[in-house]
Amino acid sequence: MARKIGIIGLGNVGAAVAHGLIAQGVADDYVFIDANEAKVKADQIDFQDAMANLEAHGNIVINDWAALADADVVISTLGNIKLQQDNPTGDRFAELKFTSSMVQSVGTNLKESGFHGVLVVISNPVDVITALFQHVTGFPAHKVIGTGTLLDTARMQRAVGEAFDLDPRSVSGYNLGEHGNSQFVAWSTVRVMGQPIVTLADAGDIDLAAIEEEARKGGFTVLNGKGYTSYGVATSAIRIAKAVMADAHAELVVSNRRDDMGMYLSYPAIIGRDGVLAETTLDLTTDEQEKLLQSRDYIQQRFDEIVDTL
């Protein structure tokens, strides 16, 4: 059976997702959905022009909701980056009103298409929007996943790697909670060179607070520099999609609705063909557990506020 992935929204992030998927040969068939007909048609032709120079071939159809019925994965990149660029508060809720209004129509179209695969959400504020997609579509919660702090964790790994002169892939551990200002690095989970980082930090000149701030603010450095973020978050979504397509049973820190939290937030889960296959349990410190609950409460509050306006 052919592997199929849909992408809703072909802006900067959606195009980066499409390029990464197609270049890596993750699927055989792709469905591009975007309100800008000229743009999505141009992307279709542009990628078709690239096929002769790629190792993998991909078939692309555009703006055909019915074609999503048998898609394995759909990735939503809805948003309006201009709202974030003009946002003086430095959080990811500037796009909430705009994106939440789109979720209603897009979620309805997605449900009516007969899609029954795994929905991966990038759109900011991602935890609230992921919860809203699940609310609007009625899809099982385990089949609706947000990229969450998978990107923030990668930023933490980069910062820690730089501090220790290591490849970021040699750093393990997680950022948890909201993909936003209430997120935190769960330092009790972070290990470097086979040791807990807190042990190494106590013994050396390592400023964990500075590393955490770098992870939290990294996205805004990119946003201020080029006007948007794309490659980091696109790669996060692709990693989730690949875990689903391969039924990898991979442990990834994604925005998911845990039974003990009752709301979407980022916490490691086992990801495979059916989305979230199992929950994990981290041995967090008391302080980390309190931060997680505070982050959960904030996401819940913002979700309740937007649901009341629908």
Swiss-Prot record:
InterPro entries: L-lactate/malate_DH, L-lactate_DH_AS, Lactate/malate_DH_C, Lactate/malate_DH_N, Lactate_DH/Glyco_Ohase_4_C, NAD(P)-bd_dom_sf. GO terms for molecular function: L-lactate dehydrogenase activity. Its EC number is 1.1.1.-. It comes from the Bacteria. NAD(+) binds at residues 34-55, 124. It holds the Pfam family Ldh_1_C. This is L-2-hydroxyisocaproate dehydrogenase. The active site is at H179 (proton acceptor). GO terms for biological process: lactate metabolic process. Can be applied in an industrial process for the production of L-amino acid.
